């Protein structure tokens, strides 16, 4: 939709009092969330349906969004978990052979409030310099209730994020003629993680976030994967306790994103909130062992403090080339390694997809 199109007004109010005036698309109303930005050029439908964005208002830095539409095949979860959506310009005439609708209709169906025709470059600079902050998108006159909204914004906090996105039921995927059985913890996992494991000959048992060591023993998997997910990792105290016990079962473990953070917390390390996070499909990561840099897809606002890990327990295997933060951990006395980025990257770079070929079974560690 042209940025000059005259449609219903919408407003973005930030915690620092900054107001952006734009136009409404998607649902109408008022929504509060943590305002973040992603630098991905494509994959907006995957962004909108990634549970890791729970409670957040997502800004797309790329200026034109929606030109290939939306379709049923690119969902990363059953629904959208973002609180709100911000773009510079959206396309109302998408063209793609897989297209089944446009992004405005998608947002309306998902009841997501969006705003377009604002200066997303200016907004991104504010977040980059001041850090992520809470904000509100509203289709009402923001100036008439600015003080009331600012109070609500400052009181807003994302809580119980993992509990809000995990499925309480255990589900099984993959063929009966599988080579391995993998227990995938659902902290807010993306479907493509599951699909990549199935494509590699695994039967995938998706288990709830609060699954215990005893329950894992009953499943008897060849490997365990801790998935991505939303929120502050340190608030998941019961999950962290379970992970500590699960790690002692001797079953190979691989963690991604939030799973990487929870595994580190379970083994004595700490996490920190990043100023504006790593969100996008162009994050450079250095593999310390190889001395090579890989381009990765990421979506996280917290990071493991690498130096907080006891060197007798684990060592940092990957670091972010931009800010030097921990991007991977390899454990010494347990059969486990974890990464902060997404090797499955759908859509995004496939530089680190080889990590998914590492066998979940100790019988064949070179696959």
Question: Model features per residue range: what roles?
Answer:
Residues 2-181, 185-202, 206-210, 214, ...:
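RNA-binding accessory domains that recognize and position tRNA/RNA substrates
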């Amino acid at each position: 939709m042209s940025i000059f199109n005259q449609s219903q007004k919408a407003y973005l109010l930030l915690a620092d009092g900054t107001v952006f005036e734009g136009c409404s698309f998607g649902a109408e109303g008022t929504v509060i969330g943590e305002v973040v930005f992603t630098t991905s050029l494509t994959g907006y439908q995957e962004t909108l349906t990634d549970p890791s964005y729970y409670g957040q208002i997502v800004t797309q830095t790329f200026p034109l969004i929606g030109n290939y539409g939306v379709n049923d095949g690119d969902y990363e979860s059953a629904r959208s978990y973002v609180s709100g959506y911000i773009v510079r310009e959206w396309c109302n005439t998408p063209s793609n052979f897989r297209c089944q609708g446009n992004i405005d209709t998608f947002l309306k169906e998902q009841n997501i409030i969006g705003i377009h025709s604002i200066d997303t470059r200016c907004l991104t600079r504010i977040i980059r310099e001041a850090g992520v902050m809470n904000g509100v998108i509203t289709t009402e006159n923001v100036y008439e209730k600015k003080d009331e909204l600012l109070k609500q914004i400052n009181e807003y906090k994302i809580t119980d994020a993992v509990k809000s996105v995990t499925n309480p039921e255990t589900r099984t995927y993959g063929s009966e003629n599988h080579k391995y059985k993998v227990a995938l913890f659902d902290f807010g996992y993306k479907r493509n993680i599951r699909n990549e494991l199935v494509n590699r000959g695994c039967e995938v048992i998706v288990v709830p976030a609060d699954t215990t060591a005893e329950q894992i023993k009953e499943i008897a998997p060849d490997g365990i994967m801790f998935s991505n997910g939303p929120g502050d990792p340190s608030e998941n105290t019961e999950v962290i306790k379970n992970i500590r016990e699960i790690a002692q079962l001797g079953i190979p473990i691989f963690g991604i994103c939030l799973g990487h953070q929870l595994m580190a917390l379970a083994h004595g390390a700490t996490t920190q909130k990043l100023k504006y996070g790593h969100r996008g499909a162009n994050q450079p990561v250095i593999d310390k062992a190889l001395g090579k840099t890989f381009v990765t897809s990421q979506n996280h606002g917290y990071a493991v403090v690498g130096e907080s890990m006891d060197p007798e327990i684990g060592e940092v295997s990957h670091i972010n080339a931009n800010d030097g933060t921990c991007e991977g951990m390899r454990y010494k006395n347990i059969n486990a390694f974890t990464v902060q980025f997404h090797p499955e990257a759908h859509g995004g770079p496939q530089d680190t997809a080889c990590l998914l070929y590492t066998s979940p079974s100790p019988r064949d560690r070179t696959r």
